[in-house]
């Protein structure tokens, strides 16, 4: 059976930090599923279709990465793909507190599921989609924080 990991997120928008985690985690799995969450609770700046398209463009150079959109429980998506490992990024202590709870919740729904946490590289430690959205909303230039493939998306906002 193939070693498959899932890296879930809203990716609103995808950042250089996300791509760094995709790059590093894709080296650990035969296949990495990047799962773009519907997430109406977060009131996304970009539609699900746009977010999926952005992540597909930004990851087109990765041979073992597949991007999918999903709605519902991540634990169920993991079962569908026969995945036993979730990939998550941790920038700050508050991320850890949230991710620890989510990891336990996912494990309670799918007992085979483990969560693998990645720390960002130093140059990406401060980058978040929230910061990028804030810069964009205030008409600032966030192009240095996101992959070049998505510059057309952020310039339209």
Swiss-Prot record:
Enzyme class name: transferase
Biological source species: Helicobacter pylori (strain Shi470)
SUPFAM superfamilies, alphabetized: Nucleotidylyl transferase
Family: Belongs to the bacterial CoaD family.
Substrates-to-products reaction catalysed: (R)-4'-phosphopantetheine + ATP + H(+) = 3'-dephospho-CoA + diphosphate
Function: Reversibly transfers an adenylyl group from ATP to 4'-phosphopantetheine, yielding dephospho-CoA (dPCoA) and pyrophosphate.
PANTHER family per UniProt: PHOSPHOPANTETHEINE ADENYLYLTRANSFERASE (PTHR21342:SF1)
The keyword ATP-binding appears for this protein: yes
Descriptive protein name: Phosphopantetheine adenylyltransferase
Involved pathway(s): Cofactor biosynthesis; coenzyme A biosynthesis; CoA from (R)-pantothenate: step 4/5
Cofactor(s) needed: Mg(2+)
EC number of the protein: 2.7.7.3
């Amino acid at each position: 059976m193939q070693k498959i990991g899932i890296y879930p997120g809203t990716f609103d928008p995808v950042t250089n930090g996300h791509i760094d985690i995709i790059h590093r985690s894709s080296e650990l799995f035969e296949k990495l599923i990047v799962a773009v969450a519907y997430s109406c609770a977060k009131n996304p700046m970009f539609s699900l279709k746009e977010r999926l398209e952005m992540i597909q463009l930004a990851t087109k150079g990765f041979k073992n990465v597949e991007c999918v959109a999903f709605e519902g429980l991540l634990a169920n998506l993991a079962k569908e793909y026969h995945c036993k490992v979730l990939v998550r990024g941790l920038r700050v202590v508050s991320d850890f507190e949230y991710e620890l709870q989510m990891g336990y919740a996912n494990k309670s729904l799918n007992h085979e599921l483990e969560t693998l946490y990645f720390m960002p590289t130093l140059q990406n430690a401060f980058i978040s989609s929230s910061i990028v959205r804030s810069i964009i909303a205030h008409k600032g230039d966030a192009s240095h924080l996101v992959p070049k493939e998505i510059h057309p998306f952020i310039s339209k906002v």
